[in-house]
From Swiss-Prot:
UniProt-listed InterPro entries: PFN (IPR048278), PFN_euk (IPR005455), PFN_sf (IPR036140), Profilin_CS (IPR027310)
Record text on subunit structure and interactions: Occurs in many kinds of cells as a complex with monomeric actin in a 1:1 ratio.
Residues bearing the modification Blocked amino end (Ser): S2
Signal sequence region: none
Name of this chain's protein: Profilin-2
Annotated function: Binds to actin and affects the structure of the cytoskeleton. At high concentrations, profilin prevents the polymerization of actin, whereas it enhances it at low concentrations. By binding to PIP2, it inhibits the formation of IP3 and DG.
Subcellular location, principal: cytoplasm
Amino acid sequence: MSWQTYVDTNLVGTGAVTQAAIIGHDGNTWATSAGFAVSPANGAALANAFKDATAIRSNGFELAGTRYVTIRADDRSVYGKKGSAGVITVKTSKAILIGVYNEKIQPGTAANVVEKLADYLIGQGF
């Protein structure tokens, strides 16, 4: 399965996230939903946050032109909020999954979808 298929089917296609991307640990985009562009600089900053979350805990982070307040940050997951919308990011051994949800979607529903896909990819060696 291609990275784009994971974005289109396993993330956005579930209805639990409205936009999604899969990026490498270097911040470069592997696949993305239409209209959602993560800059290499934002991607690299996010990747670094999994190693040291100090900066994003106090300053938040930006993805695709939206600034988020950090509500969770550890070596596996970084969650952000903007109003009642937010973003779930999960690191696997080779990639970072990003799922954005809007105010109509429950944060737990979005987190469940992104975290489960991450678990699957980790199980496949990714």
